[in-house]
Amino acid sequence: MTIRTEKVASLLQKELSAIFEKELPRSGPLMTVVQVKVTTDLGIARVYVSIIGSEKERKTAIAHLQNETRYIRKLLSAKIRHQFRRIPELEFYEDRLYEKAERIDLLIKQALGTSK
């Protein structure tokens, strides 16, 4: 990533985190913006969201985010419209890194426990 795309991604992550915290209704599981990746033409922003909840809640939350993309983009536009000519399209993805880390930790503990 270039310096510009990194700066844009960082700004988008900060602003989207604020939107998730303050402006979106909290009816489902806890969601946090983990990472934002922006294409080199700044046209698409891939937003990785960590969702704490059951499998069904996570799927519902991602579907809800994908349905509300236009609304979230409108809120984002109100915050950063003076810094960009064009607000990037948003694509939401579930970040499962925390879940994978827990699984690896459990496997390591099991392996150490059985080797004694």
UniProtKB/Swiss-Prot annotation:
Its main location: cytoplasm. Coiled coil: none annotated. One of its GO terms (biological process) is maturation of SSU-rRNA. GO terms for molecular function: ribosomal small subunit binding. It is found in: Cytoplasm. Pfam families: RBFA (PF02033). Keywords: Cytoplasm, Ribosome biogenesis. One of its GO terms (cellular component) is cytosol. HAMAP family: RbfA. NCBIfam families: rbfA. Belongs to the RbfA family. One of several proteins that assist in the late maturation steps of the functional core of the 30S ribosomal subunit. Associates with free 30S ribosomal subunits (but not with 30S subunits that are part of 70S ribosomes or polysomes). Required for efficient processing of 16S rRNA. May interact with the 5'-terminal helix region of 16S rRNA. Monomer. Binds 30S ribosomal subunits, but not 50S ribosomal subunits or 70S ribosomes. This is Ribosome-binding factor A. It comes from Chlorobium phaeobacteroides (strain BS1).
